[in-house]
Amino acid sequence: MLLKAKNNNYMYAKTTVNIRKKPSKKSKNIGKVYWNEKIQTIKKANKNWYKIKYKKKNRYICAKYLKKKPYKCKTYSSPSSNSFKSFEDADCITDSTKLAHGRLKRKYHLDYRSGVWMVGNRYCIAVGSFYAGEKVGVKIDLVLSHNGRKHTLKCITADSKANKDTIKNHRVHKDGSVAEFIVKTSALPKKALLMGDVSYAGKQFKGKIVKIKVYK
């Protein structure tokens, strides 16, 4: 018997998960959802698979990668009213897989439109130690405000800003930037390179950072 999905018909991904055409790992891969993304469940197809709604069609996802509630975060107000967003070339980050920085770096893929490196659906950044210590792989949502509208930019820590270079209890860099983006300098749009500001790398980066949501 097929079981109805609970929790208002929504669940959340524990990690990056493939969406299948049929309830089998051998079935065609239709797409994917990322960590903590909300998924509309229809019912449980069997003990291992959920039937879900994906792009207006019925698809399937492995049940063990879903959870009933979203991951919790701690929200901070931005310590800076500056819209400036600095950048760091990925070549400045170690390639050594003996360190967490290097292991995460192996997962990088480039957003060719902006020149900013990503892991999954999250942009790679460095922030002050107030938010994540010196840890890499910490998921952070930056809430930006531009022309009176707010939007969320999903990020992940790939490096940390040195305490000697930060102010306001290590929450903001001395140059006024809250987040420093990890980039491939040669792939940056010309204006972003000229201004030294990732805000000019794409519309998703525009605006002031008003909230910083840190997932623990």
What do these predicted ranges mean?
Residues 1-18, 31-35, 43-45, 67-77:
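SH3-family beta-barrel domains
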Residues 13, 40-44, 157, 209:
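A structural signal for short, hydrophobic beta-strand segments that form beta-sheets
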Residues 16, 47-49, 178:
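A generic structural signal for beta-strand entry/edge sites
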Residues 21-23, 54, 142-148:
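Short acidic, glycine-rich loop/turn motifs
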Residues 24-28, 127-128:
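Short, solvent-exposed loop/turn positions at domain surfaces
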Residues 28, 34-37, 135, 174:
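Residue-level recognition of short, solvent-exposed, well-ordered loop/turn junctions
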Residues 30-66:
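SH3/SH3-like beta-barrel superfamily modules
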Residues 75-216:
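Solvent-exposed, well-ordered loop and adjacent helix/strand elements within mature globular domains
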